[in-house]
């Protein structure tokens, strides 16, 4: 896709939160590889683990299909999210993060991402297929806040 997609123009303030996402190098590599394989479409995954006062720890990645087959958006199936949530609870875990890619733009949340962060109030890891960068964000009090990935 050529040019700049205005859906990804950052139009809101980003501040950094003290809480972190713990994601292994192996898991980072798996997510990046998956995002690259799904190009030119956005990819997405559900990350399962545990939350404490200090961090969210990712223990399992559930790669999911982007049924929208779009270069600028993805669809979260409520049934898939429910299924993953139920399986996580059976293992004393929970959904801790949503992952998705921006194949041809920066690893920053779009206005569309911000809208859906309200519906899925988890941290969101965004991978840039353009810069190969991975950043994490959460929506708190209508402000997008950046979270460290460690």
Residue ranges and their predicted role:
Residues 101:
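Short, well-ordered beta-to-alpha junction loops that form the rim of enzyme active sites
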Residues 2-95, 104-150:
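Conserved beta-strand-loop surface patch within small alpha/beta domains used
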């Amino acid at each position: 896709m050529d040019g700049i997609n205005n859906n990804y123009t950052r139009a809101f303030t980003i501040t950094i939160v003290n809480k972190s996402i713990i994601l292994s190098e192996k898991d980072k590599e798996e997510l990046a590889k998956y995002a690259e394989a799904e190009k030119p479409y956005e990819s997405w995954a559900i990350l399962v683990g545990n939350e404490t006062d200090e961090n969210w720890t990712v223990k399992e990645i559930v790669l999911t299909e982007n049924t929208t087959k779009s270069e600028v958006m993805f669809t979260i199936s409520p049934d898939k999210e429910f299924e993953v949530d139920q399986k996580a609870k059976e293992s004393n875990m929970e959904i801790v993060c949503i992952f998705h890619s921006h194949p041809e733009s920066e690893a920053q949340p779009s206005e569309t991402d911000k809208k859906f962060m309200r519906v899925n109030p988890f941290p969101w890891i965004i991978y840039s297929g353009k810069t190969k960068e991975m950043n994490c964000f959460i929506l708190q009090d209508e402000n997008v806040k950046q979270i460290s990935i460690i």
